[in-house]
Amino acid sequence: MLHKNDIIETEISDISHEGMGIAKVDGFVFFVENALPGEIIKMRVLKLRKRIGYGKVEEYLTTSPHRNEGLDYTYLRTGIADLGHLTYEQQLLFKQKQVADNLYKIAHISDVLVEPTLGMTIPLAYRNKAQVPVRRVDGQLETGFFRKNSHTLVSIEDYLIQEKEIDALINFTRDLLRKFDVKPYDEEQQSGLIRNLVVRRGHYTGQLMLVLVTTRPKIFRIDQMIEKLVSAFPSVVSIMQNINDRNSNVIFGKEFRTLYGSDTIEDQMLGNTYAISAQSFYQVNTEMAEKLYQKAIDFSDLNSEDIVIDAYSGIGTIGLSVAKQVKHVYGVEVVEKAVSDAKENATRNGITNSTYVADSAENAMAKWLKEGIKPTVIMVDPPRKGLTESFVYSAAQTKADKITYISCNSATMARDIKLFEELGYHLVKIQPVDLFPMTHHVECVALLVKA
């Protein structure tokens, strides 16, 4: 009979989709952080629930040849790099297998080759966006990340996967906040001023945006702080304030104020220029997002007569990337601000053959069908929850020749592909792309054709 705090010797037999080691002991399946298949460990039992348990490595008796020995385990404990203890070559194989397993288990597809994961040459310092909490640690204002499953801040200076200038701006701002004696947010007391720092950087332009998330409007001596920030970082073109006075884990409140410069930065994606606001959805790994979108374009095999529906269109990055190759792009996005951004981005890039509407994807699809718009290609890039059933049915009713599906969750994608196959489409290609090295997340693009 197992009990909490028992220490047992066991072998790790597998790895979960979230990068946890899996061990099977006395009928329990244990999940163990920082443990890899093939490793023999002494494990402390932390928690037992029915037939599921959680364990902690007390000692490694053998280690995997695929272990990344150079990783600072702070990045594991905070979740910044929950797959960082695995060598990068093995991370890419893990992600390929994850996609293949979901296709087989959920969609019952085993006859379509899942291509090797497209990876980065240098899988570090790639994120163009950072969101870091500000708290008091040992009497001093600190920035960093929360320890996993807690609100205990771990102080960090090098965030491993963020672009280095973003790290530098965060650390400089932290030091300024200390110098000007700005009080960090205290969740328990619901006191303090500064809750979070959010930084965005244009990968190609180098433009920087800093957002100060505060509990109230007034920031004492903010003009002096801004002067020092822009003097030290000439690439800062936007300093924003967001006011969030709610007792909530949501980072942004409703009110934004422009403290310096513009309320957007600019960047390029596949030759187009985009304005990016604090709230814009914009892929955090520009280099690999371009490869992902280019793969989607290649899969779609577009021509000048194609009519494309861009569902979940965001600020237009996918649809506007193909607009110059096709007859017309119809984009739909539920967030109204993103739709207005997409229209402005079309104008910014001289694109006149695109239409963007604010609506649910399934509603817009039904309206376009009634108007006699017949897409030849539907491109979708939904959130992690995937497509709604009603959208899949609406998409199938258009009888579009191709569905190009970009996914950030291969499990919900597999579920949706299963339904598309029942409605007369056939999966022909699927390509995983590593937009999030050192983490368990994987993007992929799949092509379905009308049978």
Curated annotation (Swiss-Prot):
Gene3D superfamilies: 2.40.50.1070, Nucleic acid-binding proteins, Vaccinia Virus protein VP39. S-adenosyl-L-methionine binds at Q283, Y312, E333, D381. The active site is at C408 (nucleophile). InterPro entries: MeTrfase_TrmA_AS, MeTrfase_TrmA_CS, NA-bd_OB-fold, SAM-dependent_MTases_sf, TRAM_dom, U5_MeTrfase_fam. Residues 1-59 form the TRAM domain. Keywords: Methyltransferase, S-adenosyl-L-methionine, Transferase. GO terms for molecular function: rRNA (uridine-C5-)-methyltransferase activity. Transmembrane segments: none annotated. GO terms for biological process: rRNA base methylation. Its EC number is 2.1.1.-. It holds the Pfam family TRAM. Belongs to the class I-like SAM-binding methyltransferase superfamily. RNA M5U methyltransferase family. This is Uncharacterized RNA methyltransferase SAG0633. It comes from Streptococcus agalactiae serotype V (strain ATCC BAA-611 / 2603 V/R). The lineage of its organism: Bacteria, Bacillati, Bacillota, Bacilli, Lactobacillales.
